[in-house]
């Protein structure tokens, strides 16, 4: 086993994984038999609970871990619900549970879920869809590789964008990565 720590960004890990909500047999996301997920250690590109488990894992061995919400996508925050005027969604055929994307004041893309709507208002949920969920991962570390200074610098600019990004654009919480059924390619 190699010795890694979250503060030392010098290597990238390559993993295969599948994730389920604890107690469910439904796979939420998986890259098994697909391209490996690669992330820079310590760059906040995947959820912290999975990153910690990867650092302790044996290369080539399947591991299983249960990750609490606090080390995954955070606890569900009722304060992340917002009622907005329906006219802000003009031209959009709304459905309960649909994902919508917007921009924050600092031009960051943010994902939200339509919880409910009426003729005059829409209830928008800015929690990550997996907030409050305990996740069960099965994963295998395929290997580690050294990263260049350019990759380290780029990871600071990319962190927080997209599914595997640090904050993932999901309410500004720590976390990101694996489990939200996004494309990782």
From Swiss-Prot:
GO terms for biological process: protein refolding. GO terms for cellular component: cytoplasm. SUPFAM superfamilies: FKBP-like (SSF54534). Its EC number is 5.2.1.8. Residues 164-178 have a biased composition (Gly residues). It catalyses: [protein]-peptidylproline (omega=180) = [protein]-peptidylproline (omega=0). GO terms for molecular function: metal ion binding; peptidyl-prolyl cis-trans isomerase activity. It is found in: Cytoplasm. The keyword Metal-binding applies. Residues 134-156 are annotated as: PPIase second part. Residues 1-99 form the PPIase FKBP-type domain. It comes from the Bacteria. Residues 164-185 are annotated as: Disordered. Ni(2+) binds at residues 163-164, 178. Residues 81-125 are annotated as: IF-chaperone. Pfam families: FKBP_C. Residues 1-74 are annotated as: PPIase first part. Keywords: Chaperone, Cytoplasm, Isomerase, Metal-binding, Nickel, Rotamase. The N-terminal region consists of two globular folded domains that contain prolyl isomerase and chaperone activities. The C-terminal region binds nickel ions. Folding helper with both chaperone and peptidyl-prolyl cis-trans isomerase (PPIase) activities. Chaperone activity prevents aggregation of unfolded or partially folded proteins and promotes their correct folding. PPIases catalyze the cis-trans isomerization of Xaa-Pro bonds of peptides, which accelerates slow steps of protein folding and thus shortens the lifetime of intermediates. Both strategies lower the concentration of intermediates and increase the productivity and yield of the folding reaction. Also involved in hydrogenase metallocenter assembly, probably by participating in the nickel insertion step. This function in hydrogenase biosynthesis requires chaperone activity and the presence of the metal-binding domain, but not PPIase activity. This is FKBP-type peptidyl-prolyl cis-trans isomerase SlyD.
